[in-house]
């Protein structure tokens, strides 16, 4: 904190407000770090965009990551989940020592969930399986060719084209497209993590807020068919999906043109 121009612990303020509002705090953590010289050599991203050559020192880097994770899991109260990303930067045979890292997390906070956006079959110690820009069992974006496991599922998607904020990116998905994606995720037993990149001043883009309101209006009317449901007994079809809650079955017809 002292080394930053802001001079305040942003995560502490966020954590305090989440706990106050009854929102479970989840942390995104990148295994990939272009800014550290000890990050292992051999990574495939960031070439030509300011990534330092570095010398690579895995022992040092692994200690650095675990020290950061320890700080996150001991300084900010209950943490709902650690959402990992970046494993895909290294060759598939690279040993990230994930089992030991996951054990550290579960030791510090036994109730903290662990997920990893590595685009692979889940590893031991992971509590849910995620799919990037695809629904479970689909691979339209070319990032989710792994098989669907028996773990709880999640799909992550962007509201426009980018994960972070980019002022030129106005290619926002329509409210209808977002609602359909949400419904399809529920029909495939998956949680939906919808990404929004905040503006430099911390505010959410007006278009993103408008989209959230539109989805919220739909959920106000039909939320019982999504919240607390599982995929229904009718398997997903091109025309739509089904969800169920208890002895109630909900049919979501999304495309009447399908025969």
Protein language model regions, located:
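Mature catalytic domains of secreted/periplasmic carbohydrate-active enzymes
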Residues: 1-259
